[in-house]
Amino acid sequence: MSMTDPIADMLTRIRNANMVKHQKVDIPSSTMKVNIASVLKQEGYIKNYKVISDNLQGILRVYLKYIDDKDGVINEIKRISKPGGRVYVKADEVPTVKSGLGVVILSTSKGIITDSAARKAGLGGEIICTVW
């Protein structure tokens, strides 16, 4: 059976692994998922990630980050734009999360970037998810 929303599946796997304090989580890989993981690492929400080749689509292994080995750095990770209802914003309408404490991840013409990078570059795009 094909997956309707692979990005939502990735975010759900990260959310579930974070709640049960797993050190790592394996996700079927894709270019977009690797780009999202890169932004999460850059913003300090995950320790690291790596792509493992399995001669099929590959596996994206995400290493989760915890505060004092008990509380997850990610409090909430939420899919915004879905296959049934895409959410696009103009450059001057890019939202903030928790008054700037969180991050909005957008898909723009320049790739997958954060809300602050989109504002600096004057770019709008599709809101993939919010993290805080």
UniProtKB/Swiss-Prot annotation:
Q: Which domain of life is it from?
A: Bacteria
Recorded GO terms, molecular function?
A: rRNA binding; structural constituent of ribosome
Q: Which organism is it from?
A: Pelobacter propionicus (strain DSM 2379 / NBRC 103807 / OttBd1)
What is the designated name of this protein? Answer: Small ribosomal subunit protein uS8
Main role? One of the primary rRNA binding proteins, it binds directly to 16S rRNA central domain where it helps coordinate assembly of the platform of the 30S subunit.
Keyword hit for RNA-binding: yes
Disulfide bond entries = none
One Gene Ontology term, aspect cellular component: ribonucleoprotein complex
Enumerate the PANTHER family for this protein.
Answer: 40S RIBOSOMAL PROTEIN S15A
